[in-house]
A protein has these predicted regions:
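Pepsin/retropepsin-fold aspartyl endopeptidases
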Residues: 9-148
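Charge-dense, intrinsically disordered terminal/linker segments
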Residues: 1-11
Length: 148
């Protein structure tokens, strides 16, 4: 069994906001949200999202127009009983020196949000295996040392 110090020494520390270098889009400030349930969300302009067969066409950050394979569809309760049906697509991206492939994202309108990517608790736990320092931003590239 790991002791308390071993548990923390083995974890990567990330800031509340990290730059995700997303294939086809570029670097996007992304919020790591441990309160967000099961799905990562990437901004898609709501007026641009189209479904053509098994392909999702949409405009996203920096006016990039993308065509992605639809892998799923989810229904999200956005609050106040409002349900939003979203297409799910996969992206490859890099955070610091770690690369991730074929990670699912729902496409949602985040035009009123400061951060155009919202990272889910499940991704943080299952893939990043990191601790989030909410007082920090963009530290994924830094070597952080902890002393006890």
């Amino acid at each position: 069994m790991k002791n308390f110090n071993q548990f923390f020494l083995e974890k990567q520390v990330l800031g509340l906001v990290e730059l995700f270098d997303v294939d086809g889009i570029g670097k996007i400030p992304s919020k790591l949200d441990s309160g967000n349930g099961a799905f990562n969300v990437l901004h898609g302009d709501k007026d641009s999202i189209q479904l053509q067969g098994n392909k999702v066409l949409f405009k996203t950050v920096n006016n990039k127009h993308l065509i992605k394979d639809k892998i799923d569809e989810i229904v999200i309760n956005t609050g106040g009983g409002v349900m939003d049906t979203r297409n799910v697509v996969e992206f490859n991206f890099k955070i610091g020196n770690k690369e991730f492939r074929n990670i699912p994202f729902s496409i949602g309108d985040r035009s009123s949000n400061l951060y155009k990517i919202l990272v889910s608790k499940d991704f943080i736990e299952d893939h990043l295996d990191a601790l989030i320092d909410v007082s920090q931003e963009n530290i994924a590239d830094e070597e952080i040392e902890a002393s006890y």
